UniProtKB/Swiss-Prot annotation:
GO CC field: ribonucleoprotein complex; ribosome
InterPro entries per the UniProt record, alphabetical: Ribosomal_bL34, Ribosomal_bL34_CS
Protein name: Large ribosomal subunit protein bL34
Highest taxon above the source species: Bacteria
Similarity field: Belongs to the bacterial ribosomal protein bL34 family.
GO MF annotation: an example: structural constituent of ribosome
Length: 48
């Protein structure tokens, strides 16, 4: 059985990136809550 986590920067950004979060209402809610908690990183996009 192969391991389930096969890292890919592109897939990670497309799924969890800033634009992906902004695209849906629930994603915007995620950003809002992360801003409220003053997270250093809002999304994985800021890893670059």
């Amino acid at each position: 059985m192969k391991r389930t986590y096969q890292p890919s920067k592109l897939k990670r950004a497309k799924t969890h990136g800033f634009l992906a979060r902004m695209a849906t209402a629930s994603g915007r809610k995620v950003l809002k809550l992360r801003r409220k908690k003053q997270r250093a990183q809002l999304t994985v996009s800021s890893e670059r």
